[in-house]
Amino acid sequence: MYNYVNETWQKMWKEKSEGIKEKAIAWRKGPTIVRIERPSRIDKARRLGYKAKQGFVVVRVRVGRGGMRKSRPKAGRRPKHLGTVKIKADVSAREVAERRASEKYPNLKVLNSYFVYKDGKYAWYEVILLDLSHPAIADEFRHLRT
């Protein structure tokens, strides 16, 4: 069944369907980090360890696209050596999304994350978080405790 869900999602993504565009417009207007009731891509979430039970939390995170922005140095130098453009981050947008979600929810642990959608300005990821103190999942994910 999840194979069909995956095929449908791929078809929507390739055809740039109106449904997903409308969702993206709503996501763009909303806050950066949003807790959602259930994953948008259930097939991907299940593959990465999500289960529909208490203690699992799914969060959609919006990350800006493009290169890093670095402030212009105050001291004089030739423009070529300013070091303000063409700077790449050492972390991926997915890692940035996971870090932001874990900062917003400090009592939860990041299990995994996956890509949802991107447009010209933003990329959206859904991050699966775990409440390790919840009795429903405490024994199953005991190895994640620090």
Where do the protein language model's features map onto the residues?
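Ribosome-associated RNA-binding proteins
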Residues: 1-146
